[in-house]
């Protein structure tokens, strides 16, 4: 049972292992959220077989886990299908490290127009290409807030001057 004032959050990440900073960030953040105030759904790939899964601890804490395909195209289709039937999220927190995340951000905006979309960069991967420059504009068009695991990660995925904007913050990979 969740009270009417509970905020609904969709967290989108890559998988349930704890091999990298992204997974550790997601695990630490979600284990420290008050699940009486925040109803969290984690949309995430399965844990790689050679890693320990964070699923048991997260589920025990009250996080709902939606396990999705590892294939990128199948994952995007699954996200679209989920958002078509779950339009009531207050916040969508999308961990991203790719150009394809920009149009996915646009899809999230269309399917959940009232949600605040937080995009979170975890990558600095030169060289900068024209496609990345276009992705910067798309992210900035559709997202409400921007996080980077560092300023360089924010600039790489969201644009050269994103850190000068008031809706950008650094969120280190440890909570």
Predicted regions and their residues:
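Membrane-interface segments of envelope glycosyltransferases acting on lipid-linked substrates or membrane lipids
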Residues: 2-175
